[in-house]
Amino acid sequence: MEFIEWYPRGYGVAFKVKEKIFEGHSKFQKIEVYETEGFGRLLALDGTVQLVTEGEESYHESLVHPVMLAHPNPRRVLVIGGGDGGTIREVLRHEEVEEAIMVEIDEEVIEVAIKFIGIDGGLLDKMMKGECKRAKLIIGDGVEFIKENSGFDVVIVDSTDPVGPAKMLFSREFYERAYEALNDPGIYVTQAGSVYLFTDELVTAYENMSRVFDKVYAYSFPVIGYASPWAFLVGIKGDLDFRKIDLERAKKLNLKYYDPENHETIFQMPRYVREMLKP
């Protein structure tokens, strides 16, 4: 048996699976969990791979740590999405963080992640019970939350792809709200889809961000389970250089995939993409 996620133009990513462990429907989406033959458990939302438990760090590390290490003192962090718990887990690796708020619209994704995925080390359960001192969970719409809340050093958007229901998270209006929610200096990051298969969406998001943020960067990273390389977009408020990270803090993290040595390589986009991203 296989699980196949089909991308545009007939491109697919497939996993051999032993069994389907869970299938359900929340108010927002279809949720599935599979046991794969070689990559642990697979979480899919509306047929789209969110993670495989053996390799998920390749996504969560590359989303979180570059921006956290580029900020001189990331004390207050907002995570929008990330119901599987991987992003908030990585945020809390940074001892500078005093408060992290995670806003997830679909509570059932969190419940499934707690029961069947377990990559968060018990963090989600503690957050659901209000027992985590440094992290707070809010069940709600991140688009609405960011309209009424501000004072964040870092904003991380861990959403589904920049097509369909998540499209609002890649709009100029949302970027304006995010910019206002950031302290100065502040830094914003979002995943932006497959470099090769969602190039047009990547360019559109980059252009929208460039109209709002003081500086915008695009980078990519090979992610297990996705149509890699996977793109990420960073928006800067104030005077920060995303290419420069705190090396001492980085060395303390001892991560599996991302480290200071490969930080420079994440900016190496294919030539045609670089040409499309030029001002």
From Swiss-Prot:
Biochemical pathway: Amine and polyamine biosynthesis; spermidine biosynthesis; spermidine from putrescine: step 1/1
GO CC annotation: cytoplasm
InterPro entries named in the record: PABS, PABS_CS, SAM-dependent_MTases_sf, Spermi_synthase, Spermidine_synt_N, Spermidine_synt_N_sf
Enzyme class: transferase
Binding sites annotated in the UniProt record for spermidine: H60, D84, D158, S159, T160, D161
Residue span, PABS domain: 4-237
Compartments (UniProt record): Cytoplasm
Alphabetized UniProt keyword annotations: Cytoplasm, Polyamine biosynthesis, Spermidine biosynthesis, Transferase
EC number: 2.5.1.16
Highest taxon above the source species: Archaea
Active site, UniProt feature: D158
Function: Catalyzes the irreversible transfer of a propylamine group from the amino donor S-adenosylmethioninamine (decarboxy-AdoMet) to putrescine (1,4-diaminobutane) to yield spermidine.
Similarity comment text for this entry: Belongs to the spermidine/spermine synthase family.
Protein name from the UniProt record: Polyamine aminopropyltransferase
Species the sequence originates in: Pyrococcus abyssi (strain GE5 / Orsay)
Source taxonomy: Archaea, Methanobacteriati, Methanobacteriota, Thermococci, Thermococcales
